């Protein structure tokens, strides 16, 4: 029998410039959602958020942002005193975004306001409220735990994408990966 060692939170990945912070995960989730809309994915539901662009006028508005897919320089456009096209698109998406997970909304808002988030801390805070505060968003911990599982699944998918795009395949050892990912 082989013992497993899993290093969590050692900072090695961040020290080497890998986008593996929780804030990176939230930004990655939002980018994927926004790119999906630009690519014609008018409906999305994953348990964390949902977007439905069904109104023909909204779809026309969305079409006006399609050029961003082809033009990598749009990020650098700065109109003094005006909202940039990227900011206009962010507002458009925000107007159509519905948080299906209160917990995911909480961590998204933390990233927006503080530029970082402590998912474990936010979870623990909400878990304590379940038992202490009658006006808590959650009646019992079951829904909160289910939402945590959805977030863990999305985070795992994001980290696999980071591994695929940022870590050279010759540096990965399939035997170690199998040991890490086995139950």
Predicted ranges, named:
Residues 1-183:
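Gly/serine-rich nucleotide phosphate-binding loop at the start of the catalytic core
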């Amino acid at each position: 029998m082989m013992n497993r060692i899993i290093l969590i939170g050692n900072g090695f990945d961040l020290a080497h410039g890998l986008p593996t912070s929780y804030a990176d995960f939230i930004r990655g989730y939002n980018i994927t959602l926004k790119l999906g809309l630009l690519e014609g994915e008018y409906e999305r539901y994953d348990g964390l958020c949902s977007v439905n662009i069904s109104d023909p006028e909204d779809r026309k508005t969305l079409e006006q942002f399609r050029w961003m897919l082809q033009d990598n320089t749009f990020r650098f456009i700065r109109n003094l005193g005006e909202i940039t096209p990227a900011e206009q698109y962010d507002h458009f998406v925000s107007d159509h975004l519905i948080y299906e997970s209160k917990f995911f909304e909480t961590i998204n808002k933390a990233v927006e306001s503080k530029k970082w988030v402590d998912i474990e801390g936010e979870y623990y805070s909400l878990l304590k409220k379940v038992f202490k505060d009658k006006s808590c968003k959650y009646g019992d911990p079951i829904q909160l735990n289910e939402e945590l599982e959805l977030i863990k699944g999305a985070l795992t998918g994001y980290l696999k994408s980071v591994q695929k795009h940022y870590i050279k395949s010759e540096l990965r050892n399939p035997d170690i990966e199998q040991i890490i990912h086995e139950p």
